[in-house]
UniProtKB/Swiss-Prot annotation:
This is HTH-type transcriptional regulator FarR. Negatively controls expression of the farAB operon by binding directly to the farAB promoter region. Binds to three sites (sites A, B and C) within the DNA sequence upstream of farA. Also represses its own expression. Residues 53-76 bind DNA. One of its GO terms (biological process) is response to stress. The gene is farR. Residues 7-139 form the HTH marR-type domain. Induction: Repressed by the HTH-type transcriptional regulator MtrR. Negatively autoregulated. The keyword Transcription applies. SUPFAM superfamilies: Winged helix' DNA-binding domain. The keyword Calcium does not apply. It comes from Neisseria gonorrhoeae.
Amino acid sequence: MPTQSKHASINIGLIQAREALMTQFRPILNQANITDQQWRIIRLLAENGTLDFQDLANQACILRPSLTGILTRLEKAGLVVRLKPSNDQRRVYLKLTSEGEKLYEEIGEEVDERYDAIEEVLGREKMLLLKDLLAELAKIEDALNS
């Protein structure tokens, strides 16, 4: 009889939960002809203004080589612009264009409506608890290495 780690199901559960959530959002993103990763970038830039490349990669959970290609496609679509400060050519900052902001507003409304529907099912208290627990779990590496 196979043995199973008592904690192995946490990773699987997180992946399954993400996939269940994405079934609510993929149709919205598909209609706008953007990917999940592109939406994460657009959302982060809309919520933070200008971000540097490294910060965007970290916050979006996208590896830097992959981010480069995604940003190139978003630039070609006229949604994102790269900015290089004159005092440090090694750094790259990213910002939404007005078209990118417009797309965020359009999609953001539908995304918020889906989150509201999810909250109706789970309840506000559980949604807040889930958000807090996920934020805590995201910082686990720091907690274990200190």
